[in-house]
């Protein structure tokens, strides 16, 4: 096991682009002993180990089997909501097993200590596992064709060259359908360059069966001179021109955040639970707001359910790069440790998260989750009275729950932000490094510049960053005062009038969605708001409590629907989808997006068009944005934030933030 952990750490550090802090912060100690406190708690290290042992002592797995997943099989939602402290906690694990080229699923009853179900899944591929990743890389770098390709470019195989297996995507012309393949580009890492992607070896790519280690093909195409080593990629990455005086967040005493049990979080009127998940990263559950002593439901569960990052370069060594990172690698599996004072305030609460590995054990990522409160520097509300020459107001404070997966060259800061006003923000900050390719063009006056930049931008001399998209799909099981909810659309319509001297104004038309499906854009109105509403309860004014879904980043995929990458990622074609709650519909692109040839996710979930009015429904939100690359992304991408807001409407009787005292002394007027 110790040897495996060392191998895992080496894999993680390499995939995270040689970030030494990742290695240093990876726990090598025995997994923590954790007691289960709630039915939605993540599997403990002991439970993961027990599940693997039960599978291996049954016919479901053997000593050679690898596990693409060993995760909590959640109880039915109705059972979770009916559970009370002190009641028994049923525990089941769901496992994905890979052995001798075959995939199967299993359900393990941990309470009864037995395997209760095994299902073969022919043609399906689990996410890329580290043992396969390492086998593929080593096989390619030992291949004579690889060595010869380097020599053609004046390079020698050795420690200054490294290669990183990527998920292969799906292109029909690939002759390796059914095999567990990865595609492998290579880079140079001499002169202690930081992530080394600054010097890609263009035209060289391996295709390897990661399961068998067979090198199926070596693409040795065009030869492009390596770009010069750019400044700013070394360990001395930042050299400020002038020192910046420290700006810090201070918290009186122990602050207002309370964390208990297994990541139960309480802050002001908010309560929720968080759990680690190898695929989703972090899942937020049982979100409630205490309204004058009454805990009210807002969300049963929220998490990232898939990503889609297609690059816009037709070159064969780039066209396959249409990554679906959650299902192909796992946001939790590649979560990075957080640094106090950089990733989170020094006053934050830092927590370690434990994940299952591929052989039935666990590893712990230290400081993988942080929870903190912060002043925004903005007023929560204010008003200036001209007659009294007096300002009244309160400063705004918010709670942030944060984790940061590092997916190859990109780091994604994923936040769930809660305010005293009852709003929830979903925020993602993209940073890290643009993926780049070498080019002969030094600047835009170079003879080849126009042709070379047809699918990207020159961001430094001899370096192009291809254009690409980012799509994050959130699964939002929102509960507005319970589970019987309806999705509404409030459209703003211009309305002519004939009195009062005006010609027109706008009015609101409300539409009910009656069936599952994508929520298409309404081009006839002056805008719209989606609203999840409970038609069976009312506020003091007899209005039905609702949650508005305010989307701010709404790019949708414009790829051809018959384009093979798009065929696997149908969720990206619409900003919102709505489906009836089903316990097995958890992932936007289906359970097995790795090497998939069709979409088994949202389009399939809603194909039967079930009725959704006054039902327990799930809203799926696609946070999409196009990345037109630019020199300002270089040498490192400044964090680019994207967000959507879940805002209460007709939910409270008044502004709920009026009841909280921020505890800040304001100067006398």
Placement of each model-derived feature along the sequence:
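Positively charged n-region of N-terminal signal peptides that target proteins for export
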Residues: 1-6
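Bacterial N-terminal signal peptides
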Residues: 8-19
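Boundary at the C-terminal end of the N-terminal hydrophobic targeting segment
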Residues: 22-26
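N-terminal low-complexity, Pro/Thr/Ser-rich intrinsically disordered segments
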Residues: 27-42
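Short, non-transmembrane alpha-helical segments in secretory-pathway proteins
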Residues: 39-81, 129-171
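Exposed beta-strand-loop-beta-strand "reactive/processing" segments of non-cytosolic proteins
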Residues: 61-111, 157-209, 268, 401
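Extended effector regions of multi-domain proteins
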Residues: 110, 115, 119-128, 189-423, ...
């Amino acid at each position: 096991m110790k040897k495996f952990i060392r191998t895992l750490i080496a894999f993680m550090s390499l995939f995270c682009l040689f970030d030494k802090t990742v290695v240093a912060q990876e726990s090598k100690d025995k997994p923590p002993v954790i007691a289960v406190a709630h039915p939605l708690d993540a599997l403990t290290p002991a439970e993961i180990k027990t599940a693997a042992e039960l599978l291996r002592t049954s016919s479901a797995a053997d000593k050679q089997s690898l596990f693409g997943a060993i995760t909590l099989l959640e109880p039915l939602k109705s059972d979770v909501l009916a559970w009370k402290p002190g009641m028994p906690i049923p525990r089941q694990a769901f496992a994905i097993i890979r052995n001798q080229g075959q995939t199967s699923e299993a359900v393990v009853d941990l309470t009864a200590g037995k395997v209760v179900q095994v299902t073969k899944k022919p043609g399906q591929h689990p996410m890329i596992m580290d043992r396969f990743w390492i086998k593929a890389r080593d096989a390619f770098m030992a291949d004579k064709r690889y060595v010869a390709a380097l020599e053609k470019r004046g390079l020698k195989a050795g420690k200054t060259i490294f290669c990183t297996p990527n998920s292969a995507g799906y292109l029909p012309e690939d002759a390796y359908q059914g095999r567990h393949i990865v595609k492998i580009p290579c880079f140079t890492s001499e002169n202690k360059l930081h992530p080394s992607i600054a010097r890609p070896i263009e035209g060289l790519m391996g295709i390897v069966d990661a399961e068998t280690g067979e090198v199926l093909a070596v693409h040795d195409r065009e030869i492009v001179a390596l770009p010069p080593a750019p400044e700013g990629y070394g360990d001395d990455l930042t050299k400020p021109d002038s020192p910046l005086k420290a700006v810090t967040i201070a918290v009186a005493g122990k602050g207002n955040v309370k964390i208990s049990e297994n990541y139960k979080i309480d802050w002001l009127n908010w309560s929720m639970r968080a759990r680690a998940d190898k695929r989703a990263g972090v899942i937020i559950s049982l979100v409630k707001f205490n309204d004058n002593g009454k805990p009210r439901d807002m969300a049963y569960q929220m998490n990232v359910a898939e990503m889609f990052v297609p690059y816009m370069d037709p070159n064969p060594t780039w066209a396959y790069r249409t990554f679906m990172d959650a299902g192909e690698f796992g946001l939790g599996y590649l979560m990075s440790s957080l640094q106090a004072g950089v990733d989170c305030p020094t006053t934050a609460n830092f927590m370690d998260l434990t994940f299952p590995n591929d052989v039935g054990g666990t590893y712990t990522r230290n400081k993988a989750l942080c929870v903190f409160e912060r002043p925004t520097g903005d007023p929560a509300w204010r008003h200036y009275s001209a007659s009294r020459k007096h300002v009244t107001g309160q400063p705004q404070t918010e709670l942030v729950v944060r984790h940061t997966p590092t997916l190859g060259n990109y780091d994604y800061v994923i936040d769930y932000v809660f305010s005293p006003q009852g709003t929830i923000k979903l925020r993602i900050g993209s940073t890290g490094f643009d993926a780049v390719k070498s080019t002969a063009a030094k600047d835009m006056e170079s003879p080849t510049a126009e042709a070379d930049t047809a699918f990207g931008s020159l961001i430094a001399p001899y370096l192009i960053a291809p254009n690409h998209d980012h799509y994050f799909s959130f699964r939002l099981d929102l509960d507005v005062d319970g589970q019987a909810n309806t999705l509404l659309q409030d459209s703003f319509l211009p309305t002519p009038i004939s009195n009062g001297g005006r010609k027109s104004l706008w009015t609101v038309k409300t539409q009910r969605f009656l069936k599952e499906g994508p929520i298409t854009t309404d081009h006839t109105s002056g805008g719209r708001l989606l609203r999840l509403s409970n038609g069976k309860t009312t506020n003091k004014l007899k209005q039905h409590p609702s949650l508005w879904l305010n989307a701010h980043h709404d790019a949708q995929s414009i790829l051809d629907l018959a384009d093979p990458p798009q065929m696997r990622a149908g969720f990206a074609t619409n900003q919102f989808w709505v489906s009836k709650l089903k316990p097995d519909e958890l992932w936007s692109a289906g359970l097995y997006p790795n090497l998939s040839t069709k979409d088994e996710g949202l389009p399939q979930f809603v194909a039967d068009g079930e009725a959704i009015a006054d039902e327990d429904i799930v809203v799926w939100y696609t946070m999409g944005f196009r990345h037109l690359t630019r020199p300002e992304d270089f040498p490192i991408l400044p964090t680019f934030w994207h967000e959507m807001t879940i805002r209460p409407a007709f939910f409270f009787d008044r502004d709920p933030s009026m009841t909280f005292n921020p505890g800040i002394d304001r100067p006398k007027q």
